Amino acid sequence: HFKPILVLCLATLALGLFVPHFAADRNSIVHLFEWKWSDIADECERFLAPKGFGGVQISPPNENLVVTSSNRPWWERYQPVSYILNTRSGDEAALADMISRCNAVGVRIYVDTVINHMTGMGGTGTAGSQADRDGKNYPAVPYGSGDFHDSCTVNNYQDASNVRNCELVGLADLNQGSDYVRSKIIEYMNHLVDLGVAGFRVDAAKHMWPADLEAIYASLKNLNTDHGFLDGQKPFIFQEVIDLGGEAISKHEYTGFGTVIEFQYGLSLGNAFQGGNQLANLANWGPEWNLLDGLDAVAFIDNHDNQRTGGSQILTYKNPKPYKMAIAFMLAHPYGTTRLMSSFAFDNNDQGPPQDDAGNLISPSINDDGTCGNGYVCEHRWRQIFNMVGFRNAVQGTGIENWWSDGNQQIAFGRGNKGFVAFTIGYDLNQHLQTGLPAGSYCDVISGNAENGSCSGKTITVGGDGYADISLGANEDDGVIAIHVNAKL
């Protein structure tokens, strides 16, 4: 008797929550960390859409605490004062304009949603509202002391109640079990759905009860069809649940009603591409590595938190050769919905985004070679990264075939008859390998771009039998080559 109901439920879930609603032939969410809304709109039109990117994760769009003590650090955006859409990135009109412009060119917007807590101190917000941290009073919502959990400190990760009912680093902890609190969160998220967003990154999901989140998500509206979404689709949900094992809370508690950001992914790949594990061992990359099922996961190499505090295993723009290799592997491998980091340069962990003397955000400048200036790293504009987004689009719908390794630090694999990649760490690769590709000449999209039938990088020739001679020197700028059918010369 239960089967038809189960099938119906699964079909309903498949219309959203677990799928990112990318337009056709697009992939990957890029986190344009601390960018202004007007700059994101420009970037959607001039770069992200033409290069095949799926969407943008934006910084929290709601009013946050102005923190002058540390010269406006990045983390002030994670201290909500209200759900008024007004931040240093722009006001509601600028946000709505960006969402419309990005959707118009097929690039989706995902909101970083901070609903676990309010501020960690008192003061004034970016829209001028007041935050009374000691009295737990936020009149612009309004929230009062009765809307929060009792004050205690998150200090025992072996105790799920401590993690979920106490205060994370002193941040006033909302009680999502309250119907009123839920109603304010739902109202905020549905306002964003009305504006045309495609989904939500849920900050600090591990610090909220799964049943409360499930109830909140169940009350979200369908995506706005005026923005090109199909009828009856729910927002894509990707939840921040840091689970590296050994704690009371498991990432699996959150997979029934949304995807989960898989922190083990970048940790293990960061270790492997720095030589801490043999690349050959990546042959069974996936759940056997204690990863979630790919359909439940958002995969990433680094994010705005762990590029600062994640330790030496986390690869970032500061270690570019293995970083680009790990990203190439992520984008070449079918696992998960992939997310890319786009940073501003920083020297200390609290440092805020590029800003003028008045605290206004400075826009990234675009250099003649397509890279960014004004203090922005723009990893998404690195050739080796955006060309692998193109690779992922070209190989969509195929599996891994023709896996090869030397048993150590050299690997290669194909994606059906659409694409092929090879990697080496530490010593030269010279092999005659089966690519699975049709005969012809291909542009290696890591070393160059394929444009108008010519290639600015290496050319790789595939014979009628699908084999090619693959050479990759240990001391080259990049320890990876990638060819695909859309880069055939």
Curated annotation (Swiss-Prot):
UniProt-annotated catalytic positions: D203, E240
Signal keyword on record: yes
Residues annotated as site: Transition state stabilizer: D305
InterPro entries (alphabetical): A-amylase/branching_C, A-amylase_C, Alpha_amylase, Glyco_hydro_13_cat_dom, Glyco_hydro_b, Glycoside_hydrolase_SF
Class of this enzyme: hydrolase
Cofactor(s) it depends on: Ca(2+); chloride
Entry EC number(s): 3.2.1.1
Entry's cofactor comment: Binds 1 Ca(2+) ion per subunit.
Binding partners and assembly: Monomer.
Membership in a protein family: Belongs to the glycosyl hydrolase 13 family.
The protein, known as: Alpha-amylase
